[in-house]
Amino acid sequence: MQLTGHLLIGQSAIAGQNGTLHAIAAATGEPLDPAFGGASLHDLDTACALADDAFDTYRDTSLEARAAFLDAIGRHIMALGDELIERCVIETGLPRARIEGERGRTVGQLALFASLVRDGGFLDARIDPARPERKPLPRVDLRLRNIAVGPVAVFGASNFPLAFSVAGGDTASALAAGCPVIVKAHSAHPGTSALVGRAIQQAARECGMPAGVFSLLFDASREIGQALVADPRIKAVGFTGSRRGGVALMHIAAARPEPIPVYAEMSSINPVLLLPAALDARHDAIAPQFVASLTLGAGQFCTNPGLVLAVDGPALRAFEEAAAAAVRAAPAQTMLTPHIHASYEQGVAALRDHAAVELLAQGAEGNRLQARAALLATSAEAFITHPELRDEVFGPASLIVRCPDADTLHRVLKSLEGQLTIAAHLADGDAPLFAALRPLLERKAGRILVNGFGTGVEVGHAMVHGGPFPATSDTRTTSVGARAIERFLRPVSYQDLPDALLPEAIRSGNPLNVPQRIDGVPAPREANHV
């Protein structure tokens, strides 16, 4: 499939005229062909008009048709074959095996939402039958279902060019909910974005979906992204990226005459707690596992373990020595973009030069675009006193906080902002301490894990990839897993409508055979007769 640099607006490919951008080869810093034309405000208006026109038609497609569309997107992504993998490797500097794994995750995510749509449980169908005999007043007939909120704007992420980008979790869950999607592609991988966008476009055409169900825009500046969030036809936003970028979009959305939600996944340092019994027994085993997680993908994971908390003593110092040795042996790695690399170097330098911080180790040197892993340490009092030590450094750097006792460790945890993950390493003797800490961990993070690291995010029904601000903008939500669909739904209640005028999901007899609750009680999936 030849890359043209065109915008994808509905079923059309249009040459953008508002400036140009080139992908940059991550390993060399050289620009890549073709040039991608930036969208104009007119292009944005066209995409939003198409999405608005498509909304009612698309949200009323049958569950099977919508699920088949999601499955078709996955098939067309797989059909891109090596072309997609090779372009993605060049643009991002990520290894081929990582990209192949991420492609599988992306397609699997689409399949999960297709299964969710076919089941129909996301509709949350509820029926409170009329009770005309109730005294002193009769009860009306009330029925409820979820509907799609409207067209959704999605901002692709830099660090997951497939799974959090054009056909990533935000797009998949919004399409599953019945929302048309307009994606603002990330400038770090426009070629990858264009290939995946064409796959979605082809799937939409194959499945007979309305033209405006999907559009892909490139932006040579920030103008189009900001205008997209401000457009009154957009009803929700999905974003994965920096705290600064997410907060800027939140402000734009809140300032609209009709404010809308921005579901932004932003900043997290993902503390790792090394509890005393585990640290005594397994420090030599935990250290290399920690460094492997820290350096995975050049540390460019939103769940990267950027903070280690432990009670100081011989076991912690032994852990530090083992981890420092592993860091020194870690090869330098290419980062996603020169800008990300420069930001990482600045973040490490700020920590290294801080009077209260000790540099324990750095990884092997590489070229000018490659990142060296870094391990640093500080005291608990310094960490609590200096809020700048709690800033995220995006990349393979982690700060160890030495706590004099468990009470101080608790104080350090209390000083933290919201997190995506908190990992605790514990042995049998640590159970009482963990039990005492768990209420605080629940207040601070969206996912709590034991004897592991947060860098693996399973796509499933029980996953939460979210957390209190600034991990995300809305602590009630997740951007990964089945519950991600809930961000793009809203409930509608129907009172005393004749059965023939009700949506099928909440009709008597349950013609769609979807899960229903009658008077709050799950009803049998076979047709019922209310």
Swiss-Prot record:
Induction: Induced by hydroxy-L-proline. The active site is at residues 265, 302. Pathway: Amino-acid degradation. It catalyses: 2,5-dioxopentanoate + NADP(+) + H2O = 2-oxoglutarate + NADPH + 2 H(+); 2,5-dioxopentanoate + NAD(+) + H2O = 2-oxoglutarate + NADH + 2 H(+). The gene is LhpG. It holds the Pfam family Aldedh. Homodimer. NAD(+) binds at residues 184, 241-246, 392. Belongs to the aldehyde dehydrogenase family. It comes from the Bacteria. This is Alpha-ketoglutaric semialdehyde dehydrogenase 3. PANTHER family: ALDEHYDE DEHYDROGENASE-RELATED, SUCCINATE-SEMIALDEHYDE DEHYDROGENASE, MITOCHONDRIAL. Disulfide bonds: none annotated. Catalyzes the NAD(P)(+)-dependent oxidation of alpha-ketoglutaric semialdehyde (alphaKGSA) to alpha-ketoglutarate. Involved in hydroxy-L-proline metabolism. Prefers NADP(+) to NAD(+) as a cosubstrate. InterPro entries: Ald_DH/histidinol_DH, Ald_DH_C, Ald_DH_N, Aldehyde_DH_dom, Aldehyde_DH_Superfamily, ALDH_KGSADH. GO terms for molecular function: 2,5-dioxovalerate dehydrogenase (NADP+) activity. Keywords: NAD, NADP, Oxidoreductase. Its EC number is 1.2.1.26. The keyword NAD applies.
